[in-house]
Structures are given as structure tokens and as C-alpha cells.
Amino acid sequence: MISISEIHLKNFKSFKNTKLKIPDGFTAILGPNGSGKSNTIDGICFVLGKTSAKSLRAGKFNQLITYHNGKRADYAEVTLFFDNINREIPIDSDKVGICRKVKLNGDNNYYVVWYEVEKQNTKINTESSQKKTSKASKVEKRRRMKKNEVLDLLSKISLIADGPNIILQGDLLRIIDTSPNERRKILDEVSGVAEFDEKSEKAKKELSQAREYIEKIDIRINEVRANLEKLKKEKEDAEKYTVYNKKLKVTKYILTSKKVEFLKMVLDETKDEIEALKETKNCYIQDISNIDSEIIGLKVKINELVNELNEKGSEEVMELHKSIKELEVNLNNDKNALENAIDDLKHTLKMEESKNNDLNETKEKINNIRIDTLKKEAEAKVLIKEIEKLNEERQNLEKKVEQSESQVKALKNQESKLSERINDTQKELYGLKNELNQLENTLNNRTFDYQKNNETIENLTNQIAEFSDLEDTKKLYKELEDIAVELEFSKKKLQEKITERNDSQSKLDNLHSEYVKENARIKTLKDMENFSLDRAVKGVLDAKLPGVVDIAGNLAKTKGEYKTAIEVAGGARLNHIVVKKMDDGSRAINYLKQKRLGRATFLPMDRIKGMDAKDISDTGIIGKAIDLVEFDIKYTNVFKFIFGNTHIVDNLENAKKLSLKYKARFVTLEGEVIEPSGAMVGGNIRRNSAIKVDIDMKKLTNLSEDIKELEQILSNVKDEIERLNNKINTCSTRKLELDNRLKIARDQEFKKEEITKSNNLKIKELNMLNSKIDDEISELTDEKEILSQKVQNLDNKLSEVMGQRERIVNEIKSYENSELSKRIKEIDHKIRENESSKNTLENEIKKGAILVKEVLIPKISELNSNIKSLADKKNMFKNSVEIYKSNIESNSSILSDKRGKYEELTKGLKDLTDKKECYELEIENLQNNKEELREKATDIDNQVNVINVDRAKYETRLEEEERKLYLCDTLENIEDISDEMIEETYSLEIDDLERNQALLESSIKKLEPVNMRAIEDYDFINERYEELFGKRKEYEQEEGKYLQLISEVQKRKKETFMKTYDRVAENYEQIYGEIGGNGKLSLENEEDPFSGGLLIDASPMNKQLQNLDVMSGGEKSLTALAFLFAIQRLNPSPFYVLDEVDAALDTKNASLIGDMISNASKESQFIVISHREQMISKSNVMYGVCMENGLSKIVSVKL
């Protein structure tokens, strides 16, 4: 077992430079009070790692450094040397030291110290020679170490500064007086259950981590579940949308196919119907012909009857009968003619109006052309005059030219003929070129249309391509998961921090309350003793220093009934001096120092801040203190600082009730105060007194430090809350952004589907159009090639003729005078130009004249003729209407008269007349049948016309339906459609198909907009959901594993602890028996010892078993020492340090304890500080400590 061999104290407390050898066994240190004997124990604790200067009986670590002769040393250093023969410390040295050094600036350093043997060569001079000898010496080595490394090293050799083997002054009674739980923890340390605690803590951390993972997984699962539920409906809609679209495509294709078939069938039927109607019409015409034959036969018979009547009756009857029939026929014809005349009149009026409109438009065109022609004729006349002048000049020039008449004439004749040929050819070429230009224009237009369609197709294709790089929603959903976890955990941490803030705020409020109370107590004492304060204030105000305003109380006023309450609420702060700036306050403070006027408090307006009072409306509340005071608004912060969250109430009873409800300061009208903490201030208001009292500022200082510390903690917590709030806001914003991006992605997907569908349809239509244009271009190109070839041939012919003419002209030029020829040439050129311009104008005039003469004037004539004809017709029809109306009236009257007369004359010729009438009736019936047949024939013509109109409509519809069929997706191109669906759709009629199409289109419209990514996203999210559930099960298994591990560790911890407890309890009973009494240890909770404490019962000699609480100080010390020795016997420490543990023992018990230490020192080192002879006499070595010149000195005595 390792032991301390030596202690070196250098500049440590009262020791300047002291080395203290510590042998095995029992070492006693004694000396008078204040000699510094306990400083040796402090040195040991210092090296063993005490972290608090106060535990070493110093304010700060640098106060451990020796202070002597008015000067403090540069550092303090203590080294504990250990016997390392067994190499328990892993350094190859028999003696190893642990050193701790503290400097004036408070820096602490640790070192490991050992000694190495080095040989040194020395020379010895003699008279005859020099000899070399070697001498071994020990050299100190040290290596700096970290504190944790030192503590780990000490722990390995069972040396701990806070262990039960080091008992300082007062520790013995603290062991007894401490709580049972703290006492049990001593056994925890002895039994080594900390190892299990570490394992348990590690397992708990792992368990916590597993649970945190589960919590995170649950958040992810909830987020994924929410997305899954949202996507489920969208997926179903997308699937429906896909199915509906497929059905719609099939329905459209089959419906359009059936419509095409139906229209073709209808056209065939109409063709057959027209043929049948024409055959029927032919039958009617044949029937009419037959009726005409019958009518002729009947008329012959009637003539015979008439002849017979003539023979038998008077001619007058016959004439009268004939006249009646003619009148009846004429009357019927006039009625029919009247109806027709009225219809014709209406039609004529419409035609007349239309022709008049055309006539006005045509006249306007003629007028415009005539105006234009007059302008051009004027221009042409000017050109003609100029040409005449030029021709006259040319003739004069030609007369002057002498030339060979015969040759020049012949050449000119040839040139003239060639010119005519050239003119004819040019005209023909001009016409062909015009035709070619028109053809090229048409070709260019169609080519332009073709290219424009291609550009449109390219644009439409590009529009589709723009949607190829849509945002990956899988990444967005994954990021939403991460954000959800971060957001939920941030909210959880925020709640924890808010709870911590509230707790800290509550503690702070309590501390503030205590501080205010203590400060008020101190202020009262100061007010009682320090009457110079008013003098200081008065001195500053009288000095009228720059920036000094006044005391706060003078800057406000209140009503008389509130005076006491406001004075108490403001307290001494009302006497604080208000200054404009901090510099003004500094100036006033310096003034007080210079004049020695005392002290005063200053409130700088540029820095002072206060607390806003909360709004409280309840029984007894008069108002906020600050609201019951009148002051200039610029002093608002000053009075916020003075009054804070203070409210004035009517009486103490209401104040008490209000303080239970609200966290505020309440002051009654009589001056009682209830602080937010619940503290109450009241009673009789006392005046200043001259009695002086000592003022202990320690509590106030401690409260102030605690407040600062808690305020810092609260500030940190608030910062963390703010950070978490910012993080939550950031996460929430990010989540909204991701949700928005998801929505945009869904909308873009739907837009892509819509645009793709629409654009593909347009592209297909444009391709169909381009196919037709391509055919047109091909035809136009062929025509262009033919025309181009004709133009080329004419160009070649023209070039040849012009070449011949040029040769002749050159030959003529050779006979001509050069100067005259040049002028003639210029004249000819000018004439040609003018002729050309004149011809152009004449052509345009001719065109206009032709247009007027051949088109517009004939059209006007035609229109006038038509209008005149229509006017004549109109008049004729009007006259006809009047005539027919007059005839009908006249003939109706005549017919009535003749019928009366006829009836009188025909009484005797009834049979013949009846027979004749019968024939006439039969003729009339035949005529009616004939008319009916004519009408039927006319109806057939009308029906044929109607059918032809309908046929034209059907042909247009067929063309449209064929176009639609071309644009439809064929059944082969529609994916995933069943034969059953096709057969079922084919089985429906057109009406059913149209209804189905309307229903499908309506269903699709209701579903829109559709998230077409939902199917893919749903599958992805569903897989993620399953994956997360799998992970959760894994973490649940981990959780179970750690729970089981914690349970096993706790079980082993309890078993280990109980073994230690049983042995310590046994040792305790044995040791207490050795000192003449009975003792017993027991656990508060034997089932779960760690949830309870350790109880110690003892019965000193000749006393009953009793509780610690009723024992004397000596009995408690004896019991504590028995407890410590019981532990020592169980697990002896390498050494023990006891500082005046026998102080409360009587002589007998001190001797007994001395014997126990002496016996125990056979196994462990004991260093004991004591004044008792009974203790010291049992030691092996004794050190005496005394104080000389402010430094401790040590004298050793071996006993």
C-alpha cells in the first residue's frame, strides 16, 4: 500500500519553506491555537485537489501565498511525496511527488516530481598526480500535468480530497448532523457504487438518446403521416384523373370514329334519298301527264253535254254556266295570284334595298377612279408635249445628218422590226414575270406560313421542355421531416427554458424582495445614523452645478390624500438628485468629495431606466403610483425607476388579496407595503434618530452577488429563449417556404400536364396543316419551274434579238455624225423615259377606264337596270295587288248574281247539268290532284334543296370530325387500356358516348387542379413511413435493452451496497462495543436503500440506545468516529488525516479513540492534529508547531 513519505510546504500560508517527513503509523501534530498546525492539513488538501479557496480557509487562492514582513511571496507550492517502491505510480522512481503551485495572479499548476541519480566526475589534486573520482547525486525532475490527470492518478491510489479519510475541523459533527441521505452517500462512496452509477448514467444517457431518437422518429412519423394523409386524397384524385383521361381518350376516339362513320352513312343515305325523291318526282310528273290526258277526255265529254244542252236548252243557260265557271276559276286564280303578288312585293323590296346599297358603293369607287384618272391624264399631257418637242428636235437633227439613205433606211427598217419584236417579247416576258412574281409571292407566303408553323411548333415544344426540370418533391418532403424534428425539439427546449426562466424569475423576485427588505433595513439604519445625507443634497442643489435639475420629489406633485402612499412608494429615491447626464453626476460627486459634504444618489436622465407598471383593475386599486403623480413627460424614465411596478391601494386587506393574484408591489394610503415576493412593510413611520448602530453589509452584498449571478443566468436563459424563438420562427418560415414550394411543384406538375396536352394537340394540328401546305408548296414549285423555264427561254430569245438590234444600231451609228448622234441618242433616251412614264400612266388610266367601263359602269347599268326592273316589278306587284283585290271584289259580286240567275234557268235541265257538273267536278278534282302533284313535285325540289343544304352541313361536319379524329390519340397509343373497356365503349351509342364524354370532362374538371406527382410522392412517402416504423422498432428494442441493463446495474449496485452496508454495520456494532457501548446502523428503506438514508443509533456506556438528535457533542463525536473506523476496517485508506476530532471527547473516550487510531495505524498512515495528551501519547511521531515572527516552525519528537 502506498503511503505519504514527506510534505514540502513552500510559501504556503504561515510556512516559509518547511519539509515534514511522515513515517508509517500514527503521526501527531500539536501546537497552540494560531500556530499554523492546521495549515499542514490544508497543504495536503491543496495538493489533493480542493477546488474552493474557502474550503482551505482563504478568500482566494492567491491568499494561500505566505504574507510576511508586509510583502506576499511570488507563489506558494506544496508537494506530497509518496513511497513508490512498489511502483503503484507509473514512474520509475522510489519516491514520487505530486506538486501544486499557485501564483499571485491565481493561476494553478500541477506537477509530478521525482528524482533521478546522475554521476558527476571530479578531480582531486595531489602533489604527485591528479585522480578522477565519480560521485552520484540526485537531480529533481518535474513534469507539468493537467488537473484531471493528477486527480485520476490520485484516485487510482485511493487518495481523494473530499473522501471520508480526511476529517477537518467541524467535519465530524457534520457527518452526524447531516441528513440520512448524505450519510448514506458516504457508504455509496466506500462501496464503490459510483462505478455502477457511471454505468447506469451511461445506460441512462444511451436510453435517453434512444428515447430521443424515438421522439425524433415519432415527429418524423407524424410529419410523414400528415403528408401521407394529404397525399392519399391527391393520389386517389391523380389516379382517377389518369383513368378518366384514358377513358376520355378512348371515348373521344370511338365517338369521333362513330360520328365519321355515321356522317358517311348519312351522306350516303342523303344521296340515296335524293335519288329516291327524284324518282318520286318523275312519277309525279308522269301522273300529272296522265291527269292532263284525263282532263282532256272529260272536257270532250263536257263539250258533248254542252252540245246536247244547246240542243235541249237555251244558249243563254250554257253561256251563263260557262260564265259562272270562268268566274269561279278566275276568282280562285286571282286569290292565288294576290298571295303570290304580296310575297313577290316583299322580296322585291328587300332586293331593291340591297341593290341600292351596291349602287352607292360602286358609284363611290367610280368617283375615286375618275379623280385619280384626271390627275394621271394631266401628268400624261405634260409628258406628251415634252415628247412632241423632243421629236421635233430630233427631226431637225436628222435633217442635218447626211447619210447613205438606202443603207440607213434598210438598217432602220430592220432595227424597227427588231424593236417591234423586242417590244412584243418584252410584253410577253413582262406578263410571264408578273405571273411568276405572283406565283413566287404565293409560294413565299405558303413557305412563310410553313416556317411560322414550324417556329410555333418549336416554341410549343420548348414550352413543354421548360417543365422538364421541376423541383424534386422527395427532397422537399425529406427536408420537411428535418424541419419538423428541429421545430418540435426547439419548442420542447423552449418550454423547458421558459419554465427555467419562470423559476429563475421567481427566485430573482424573491431575492429582489429580500434585497429590498435588507436594503430598507440598512437604509433605515443609515437614515437613523447619517443625518449628513440631507446636507449633501442641499450642498449640491445650493451649488447650482451645471446639469443638476433638482431632487426627484421636487419635480412632481400629487394630491394630499396620496401623499403618504407616494412618499412610501418612492422612499429615499424621492430624495435622489436628478441630473441631465452622467457627466453631470460625476461632476456633482467630485464636488461632494472636495467639499466633504457627504454622499448623494444621482439619477442621470440620459441613462436611467425603470420598470413599466402592469395594468391591474381590481377591487381596492386606486391606480399605478406613477399615474398618481404629475410631472413633466421628460422625467418619465426617472419616475419609472422610482416607482416601478408599484400600485396604490385603499387598505391593507385589499392589498393582501391583490398580492395573492398579481406579481406587483402594493402600497396602501397609510403607507403599508406588500412586495411581489409577499414581504410586507408597515407599522408606525419613525423619524430620524441620533443613535448609531453597526451596519452589517455582508447579507446585502451576498444578496447583490446572488442577484447578479441569477440575473446573468436569467439573461442567458432569455438569450436562449430568444435564440430558440428565432430558431422556431426560422424553422416555421422555412416550413412555410417548403410547403409553398411543394404547392408550386404540384401546380407546376399540373400545369405541365395541361400545357403538354394542349401543346401536343396544337403541334399535331400544325403538322397536319404543314402537310397540306407542303403539298401546296410542291405544286407551286412545279408551276414555278415551268414558268421559270418559259421566262428563261424568252430571256434567251430577247437577248438574241437585242443582240441583232444592237449590231444594226452600231452599224447605223457608224453612218451618223457623232455629236448629232449623241444628242439624238440623248433625245431618244429621254423620249423613251417619257414614253415609258406616259405608257405607265396610260396603262393605269386604261386599267381604271376598263375597270369603270367594263366592270363598274356595266355593274351600275346592271344595278340601275335591276333597280328599275325591281321598281317596275314593285309597281307592277303593287298594281297587281290592287287589281287582284279589285277583281276579287268585282268577280265575287258578279258570280253571286249569275249563280242566282243560273239556278232559275237550269231548273229544267238538271240531269244534263248535274252530269256536266259531275264532269266538271271531276275535272276540278283532277285539277286539284294535278296541283297537289305539282306541289308535291315542288316539295320534292324543296326537300332536295334542304337535303343538299343538310348534306353540305354534314360534309362540313364530316371534314371537322375527320380532323378531330386525326388529332385524337389512337387506341394503340393509349397506354394500359383493356380490351373490355374498348369493347364496352364500342357497344355504346353516340348519344351515350356524348353523355359519357360530358360526364368524364365534368369529372376531370372537378378534379382539377390535380397533383400528378402525388402517386409517385405517395409511394415514396409510404416507403419512408414503413422505413421509419422499422427504425422505431429498432430503437424500441434498444430502449428495452437499456432498461434491462439499468435494471441489472441497479440490482448489482444494491447487492454491492448491501454487502458493504452489512459489513460496516457489523464493524460499527463491534467498534462501539469496544468503547463500552452499543451501536446500530439501519436503513430508512431496506427495499430501496438509495431512496432513503442511513440512520445511526448508539447507546454510550451505561445509557439506553438513543437517536443522534438527543446526544451530547462528545457522544456525537464518539459515534461519528466509530462510524469512520467501521468504514476504515472494511476498506482501509492509505492514510487518514484527522483535525482535532477529539476536541469534544472526555478524557476516557479520547484515550479510547487514541487506542483505536494506534491499532488502525498498523494498516494505514494517520496524521492527527490534537491538543489532547491522551491522543498525542498514543502516536509514533509527534510534531510541535509554533509561531515565530509571523511564520510557523516545526519541531519533531519521536516517541
Curated annotation (Swiss-Prot):
Alphabetically ordered keywords of this record = ATP-binding, Coiled coil, Cytoplasm, DNA-binding, Nucleotide-binding
> What is the top-level taxon of the source organism?
Archaea
Q: What is its main location?
A: cytoplasm
The record's InterPro entries line, in alphabetical order, gives:
P-loop_NTPase (IPR027417), RecF/RecN/SMC_N (IPR003395), SMC (IPR024704), SMC_hinge (IPR010935), SMC_hinge_sf (IPR036277), SMC_prok (IPR011890)
Knockout-associated phenotype: Mutants show a high rate of anucleate cell production and a subset of cells that is extremely enlarged with irregular morphology.
Q: Identify its protein family.
A: Belongs to the SMC family.
Q: What is this protein called?
A: Chromosome partition protein Smc
Provenance organism: Methanococcus voltae
